[in-house]
């Protein structure tokens, strides 16, 4: 088996705003190192062609503060802000030669600041399977002025180029428990509102706009799945999966489709083994929950 590209230490799945702030300058430098490692890895793989990486000049402080004023009370997480200050958006694409034909295959992208725009998002979801033990209390939405109920969670588009669904930076969501060190078990936290589909929110405490936002994925069936606790973790996962088609589905109930699995098996078999092992753990946990519920 060919080794995965060297990406440094695995991201912490339960990172919070304070830890994120302390790590943000280092995280932005690590993002550059990770990108270079993946570029080298891709160029070394037989059949990979036309590896293209583009980035923009960093966003200025005035631009970053303007975004926060425009979308108040939401604030950019420190790691994402540090990334945007170095590179205001990025895109890495590559093609694959297969049976004598070269075609686009991998794509990794982070929106520029101006494209991190609000996404429509319903609130007050519940776990659709009734598995409340899958969810834990997370950052919560802010209280609406003059009311005793929490305002809706908010979401912003993180990757407008994703054709497999929507990648969102979500404020005030409830994250799943049991997430692995790199967020691999995040699919256990799929939740939806009865009558709608969105990340769960809580009204118990705190202000979601002040907390570290998480990264969620909405698949083409409109189901939301937790990806990572921080932007830094998401960036590392994106690179670990080489931007292969439908890689986000490794974190959903649907899982990877057969074609995606074939590409993973060829280009990064270790990653596929991890995905399959985590899915097996998830299925076993689901069986145990059903047995407990039947007692």
Question: Where are the model-predicted features located?
Answer:
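Core residues of folded domains in eukaryotic genome-function proteins
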Residues: 154, 211-213
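Intrinsically disordered, low-complexity domain-flanking/linker segments in eukaryotic proteins
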Residues: 133-141, 177-207
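Short Lys/Arg-rich cationic patches that frequently serve as NLS/NoLS or arginine-rich RNA/DNA-binding motifs
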Residues: 188-198, 282-295
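Short, surface-exposed beta-strand/loop "edge" segments at domain boundaries and coil↔beta transitions
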Residues: 163-168, 178-179, 221-229
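N-terminal processing/targeting junctions
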Residues: 127, 177, 182, 243-244, ...
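Short linear, low-complexity motifs centered on an aromatic residue
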Residues: 246-270
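Compact beta-sheet-dominated globular domain cores
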Residues: 213-223, 229-254
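A surface-exposed partner-binding patch
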Residues: 2-169, 174-176, 205, 252, ...
């Amino acid at each position: 088996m060919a080794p995965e590209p060297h990406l440094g230490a695995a991201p912490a799945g339960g990172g919070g705003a304070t830890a994120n702030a302390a790590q943000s300058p280092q995280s932005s430098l690590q993002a550059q190192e990770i990108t270079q490692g993946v570029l080298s890895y891709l160029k070394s793989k037989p059949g990979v062609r036309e590896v293209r990486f583009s980035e923009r000049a960093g966003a200025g402080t005035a631009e970053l503060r303007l975004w926060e004023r425009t979308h108040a009370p939401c604030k950019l997480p420190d790691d994402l802000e540090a990334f945007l200050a170095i590179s205001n958006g990025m895109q890495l694409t590559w093609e694959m030669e297969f049976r004598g034909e070269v075609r686009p295959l991998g794509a990794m992208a982070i929106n520029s600041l101006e494209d991190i725009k609000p996404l429509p998002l319903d609130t007050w979801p519940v776990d659709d399977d009734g598995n409340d033990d899958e969810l834990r209390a997370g950052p919560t939405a802010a209280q609406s002025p003059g009311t005793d109920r929490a305002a809706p969670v908010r979401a912003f588009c993180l990757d407008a180029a994703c054709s497999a669904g929507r990648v969102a930076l979500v404020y005030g969501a409830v994250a799943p428990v049991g997430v692995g060190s790199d967020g691999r078990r995040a699919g256990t936290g799929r939740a939806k509102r009865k009558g709608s589909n969105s990340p769960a929110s809580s009204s118990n405490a705190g202000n979601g706009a002040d907390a570290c936002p998480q990264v969620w994925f909405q698949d083409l069936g409109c189901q939301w799945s937790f990806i990572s606790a921080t932007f830094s973790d998401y960036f590392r996962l994106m690179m670990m999966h080489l931007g292969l088609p439908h890689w986000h589905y490794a974190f959903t109930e649907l899982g990877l489709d057969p074609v995606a699995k074939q590409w993973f098996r060829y280009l990064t078999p270790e990653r596929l083994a991890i995905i399959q092992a985590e899915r097996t753990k998830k299925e076993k946990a689901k069986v145990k929950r059903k047995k407990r519920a039947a007692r």
